[in-house]
Regions:
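N-terminal small-domain helix-loop-helix segment of the aminotransferase-like
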Residues: 2-105, 112, 297-298, 304, ...
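Short beta-strand
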Residues: 35-37, 324-329, 361-362
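Conserved core of the PLP fold type I
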Residues: 64-207, 219-234, 380, 386
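PLP-dependent enzyme catalytic core of the Aspartate aminotransferase-like
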Residues: 85, 89, 164, 345-348, ...
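Conserved core segment of the aminotransferase class I/II
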Residues: 236-308, 391
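Accessory recognition modules or surfaces
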Residues: 281-286, 308, 333-353, 376-377
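Conserved glycine-rich beta-strand-loop-beta hairpin in the small C-terminal domain of fold type I
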Residues: 288-295, 307-319, 325-337, 367
């Protein structure tokens, strides 16, 4: 028999994955071209050709004992150094390989970070709406999320005042996801500065260390003049969890890292802890081929303009029909107000028109729904009549 801890997780499967599986069933009946699947954040822009070429060359030329052998749990030194130098060139920092630990994607990065700082009963602050897998990660270590309510009137910016009110001596971290999944909001420098100043005051008041865990898989996916602040510039005790899944369209390859800035408290021991957690959690090390490829390709990006066009067209199309949407500044999600209180029921209405979406309640954001527009542009265009038929029932 499976454990009591796992049973509710097994049978309460992710709404995102559930809708994705529903989409496959509909596609088998109506044809995939007649199903408009906006459920899963699965990049559909191909990885850059240069990355593919790097992988092929590595397979042909690299010493097979190095390519397929064990390595440091923190990863290859040359990959860690290449990432540090890329960050230095972008943010004017002075990181080295010693500040970087390679991981099997952002989920792994989050887990080894939490394993390193959390004790049973500790609290971690999250800003709703948020990626609900955080709850599962926290439960792995006996810790609990403390949820800050969403504020549509501010564009879903973090509520610093409520955050301060909910910080206790048990608070170990605050999770920031910027650009945000599911809203597409980008938290600007002034918001990060306010949040950082508040946390500095709370650290001093309580005599504790409170980390910012900055979950940044969408960092490179920003539009127009939007910029993602480098949080260590504002707050020393920042831990950056990064993934190449979105920036290089590599979600299946599971490659990312944790950055531990040298100004954070006890950073050297923290890096050792992350490396040890990689081993303890059975990850051991990030995939070898992907590490070596990333070392050659840190400056590459996938086609952000493609996502920007999809987001703009979807936003304009739905707002013209009467829907209220948050205009995305980053990531590849459109956050839309449900015309009825029951967002799950409304998503079922959309499904009847063969449009697959994710209810906002799956992100602790009831009354909204999320559309993931990492789809073909034809899917965006061809879905408009289906959206329109539903909109006419509510907006005339």
């Amino acid at each position: 028999m499976i454990s009591n801890l796992m049973r509710p997780r097994v049978h309460g499967s992710s709404a995102i994955r559930r809708m994705f599986e529903e989409g496959k069933k509909l596609a088998s009946v109506y044809g995939p071209e007649n199903v408009y699947d906006f459920s899963l954040g699965n990049p559909n822009v191909p990885a850059p050709d240069e990355l593919r070429d790097a992988m092929i060359d590595i397979l042909k030329t690299e010493d097979p004992l190095k390519l397929h052998g064990y390595m440091s749990n923190a990863g290859f030194d040359e990959t860690r150094q290449a990432i540090a130098e890329d960050l230095n060139s972008r943010f004017g920092t002075s990181y080295s390989a010693a500040n970087v630990v390679m991981t099997a994607g952002a989920a792994s990065a989050m887990n080894i970070t939490m394993r390193s700082i959390l004790e049973p009963g500790d609290e971690v602050i999250v800003f709703a709406p948020y990626f609900l897998e955080y709850n599962n990660y926290l439960s792995n270590y006996g810790s609990v999320p403390v949820v800050i309510a969403p504020h549509p009137e501010s564009g879903f910016m973090p509520d610093v005042q409520e955050m301060c009110a909910k910080i206790t001596p048990k608070t170990k971290a605050v999770i920031i996801n910027n650009p945000n999944n599911p809203t597409g909001a980008v938290y600007p420098a002034e918001v990060i500065s306010q949040l950082a100043d508040a946390l500095k005051s709370k650290q001093e008041e309580l005599g504790t260390v409170i980390y910012i865990i900055s979950d940044e898989p969408y960092r490179e996916l920003v539009y127009g003049d939007a910029k993602v602040p480098h949080i260590p510039d504002f707050y020393n005790n920042t831990l950056i969890c990064y993934s190449y899944s979105k920036s290089l369209s590599l979600p299946g390859e599971r490659i990312g890292y944790v950055l531990v800035p040298p100004q954070s408290d006890g950073w050297e021991e923290f890096v050792l802890s992350l490396s040890t957690a990689n081993r303890m959690l059975g990850i051991v090390n990030a995939p070898s081929l992907q590490q070596l490829a990333i070392a050659r390709c840190t400056g590459l990006r996938s086609n952000v303009a493609f996502y920007e066009r999809n987001g703009a067209d979807l936003y304009e199309g739905l707002t013209a029909m009467g829907f209220s949407c948050v205009k995305p500044d980053g990531a590849f999600y459109l956050w839309v107000k449900s015309p009825i209180d029951d967002d799950a029921a409304f998503c079922d209405e959309l499904k009847d028109e063969r449009v697959l979406s994710t209810p906002g309640s799956a992100f602790m954001g009831p009354g909204y729904f999320r559309l993931s527009y990492c789809v073909s542009h034809e899917t965006v265009v061809n879905s408009m009549p289906s959206f329109r038929r539903v909109a006419e029932r509510y907006f005339g």
